[in-house]
């Protein structure tokens, strides 16, 4: 095995060991020393690859995004209508993260954008932007005529809508998270209709308010 390959294998082993420990003991309780021991490396080696548990979680998110992207491509290719494609993008993520639902629930406490583990943080920016690109593509390929003020913001709005669904799913106690799937189905229809109606003159004041709100949130 070449040195770069061995280094990548060690990094992956530490990441996998950490995720197992986070599942078993919780993110807050697990220590870097325990992670190193579980991975079979020295504590210093664990810190060489990841300077903190936060860095490990960001690496987990990054790996998940890379693994999800071909699945998201398939999801878009498998549907033709806007609602179906929007729903498919979300359902692919729910399916992928199902084994990690407990871990995501623990990490959901860190939603403050100032926290590095927040999906809204600067540290998560690259992962977030890669995901937003799929919503950009969804809108572009739908050929829905969008108002000039709303169009550039809409991919980010759809991404935030998706994050709301995922947060609901994390805490959904219904059997098989049935309520989430119902929410996704019904809300995708509503979102689609609102987007198609957004250019109507009568909705201009409401649209302006939405645009200003999103601009405030995103800075």
Q: Where are the regions a protein language model picked out?
A:
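Secondary-structure edge/capping motif, primarily at the C-terminal ends of alpha-helices
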Residues: 75, 79, 107-115, 142, ...
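Short acidic, glycine/proline-enriched loop segments that cap or flank alpha-helices
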Residues: 145-156, 171-175
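Hydrophobic alpha-helical connector segments
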Residues: 59, 73-106, 118-121, 125-127
